[in-house]
Amino acid sequence: MLLVLVSVFIHAACSNIEEQATKPIGESHLSADDVYVGFVIDTLKEERWYSDKEIFEEEVKQLGARVKTLAANGNDDVQIKQAELLLEEGVDVLVVVPHNAEISAKIVEMAHFAGVKVISYDRLIRNANVDLYISFDNEQVGKLQVEEILNHVSKGNFAYVGGAESDNNAHLFRQGAMSILQPYIDRGDIRIVLDEFTEGWNPSIAQENMEKVLSNLNDIDAVIAANDGTAGGVITALTKAGLQGVPVSGQDAELSAVKRIVDGTQTMTVYKSIQSLAKHAAKIAVQIAKNEEIETNQTINNGKIDVPSILLEPIPVTNNNIKETIIKDGYLTEADIYN
């Protein structure tokens, strides 16, 4: 029944959009004042996505264009419907943070049918003719996480707590992490006692997965957590087991995580400048809507095509460089962190 309903819904979406598919992709020539940008976000449950939304919207408006953001609360059907609504409203370009990398291919299909280009933001939409991808070097994120943990401990029982399996970035983080860990595993220095994705990036699920391991093995030497949310869940589990202070990685430089770094319960996070990402994406969105050429620095294969891509550099953050990184960049203030 569910499959039938989804099928009917998608058919309806395409039928509605068919009425307005009057121009081939890229043939419009608009001024900034005429541009209408649609921003479809997976969720606003995590702290960082509020920053993306606010910075992106502000930059689009500064460029003289209009923008509307819709968040799907982690629901694929809702995200497809929101994309459909924006297309029906006549957006000139669609920027998408996909909940599910595969299912979101339908959004690209609908947008192209309506003559609208699609930018995949932060997370890559797979198996679709995505027009442009902007993100960070996500394999490098995983490498940075492991490298910093190895500065503290390079032998023993390690856990890998990944992100959502439906998120292409989660796979890239893991690939980067394992590329550094593998030689240590091969020579027997490191034993992986947990290697699981975390449904929906949910900190509670990360905590549960960690607690299951700790119920059988109260000897964990380090945890590679894919982001700050999962790190928070892991640290709660470790603390309950009397293991607070075990090296734990993270990502996103969330305020709660940076405070944990100061307190010594989290070892590091990875700062990905949301200012840089959101502003860059906003400028590109307006340029694409105006049919201007975009310079990219590489391509990333999404299973179907080599997607023109712009990848920004992530930055590792520890207790030693908080002031030189996230505070200097204006992302957080000393008062935020230390009060």
Q: Which residues are covered by each model-predicted region?
A:
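Sec-dependent N-terminal signal peptides of Gram-positive bacterial secreted proteins and lipoproteins
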Residues: 1-18
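A residue-level marker of the well-folded mature domains of exported/periplasmic proteins
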Residues: 13-339
